[in-house]
Amino acid sequence: MSHKELWNFVRIKKNTSKLLFIHTPKCGGTYTNNILYDLKIINKNLPVNRKNHIPANGNEKEITFTIIRNPVDRFESLLNFRLGMDIFEDWPQHLHYVYNDKNITLNEIVDKMSDDEILSFTPYKSLIYWTKNVDIIITIEQLEELLNFFDYFYDHNIYKKENVSIKSRGVFNNEVKNRISKLYHYDVLLYDKIKNSTFFHNCT
């Protein structure tokens, strides 16, 4: 069964073509939100608080969808993003000093984090958490195809990526990549499963 056949199955099962976006953090959501806003597609975050991330509960009448990305790239993006902001409450207390020393690399920072600290960022959480009860899971590369399938059309050339993290501390080396992959093992399995196809699990 092709991914379009799966999408059509969801549409028939829920008897609607209305979409509801579930914003998984650090997966291109800001860029996507700009497109969806212009298309008047509902976002689970809006209109209560555009910055909040609200998971699906499985009772939505609309077709819920979310976007995920490579879990290692996602975590690297999170850290680079955080290091460009003020210190968040969930940032490890013993690593506050790295904000004052730009020479400390991303790999050195991760090396000093415990596994629990790596897994405790919020509202970041795991891809498994954010995709629970979601009807359709895609990658950012599949966004335009999905929207077109449900009769939403836009010119992707007028939209630019936003909140792109500046990699001033470098990128992950292979050792750190392997560690993050193991810690987010199930996220990696999920991402690999839908990378070249679409996976849904709420309308079965």
Predicted segments — roles?
Residues 1-204:
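Membrane-interface amphipathic segments in extracytoplasmic regions
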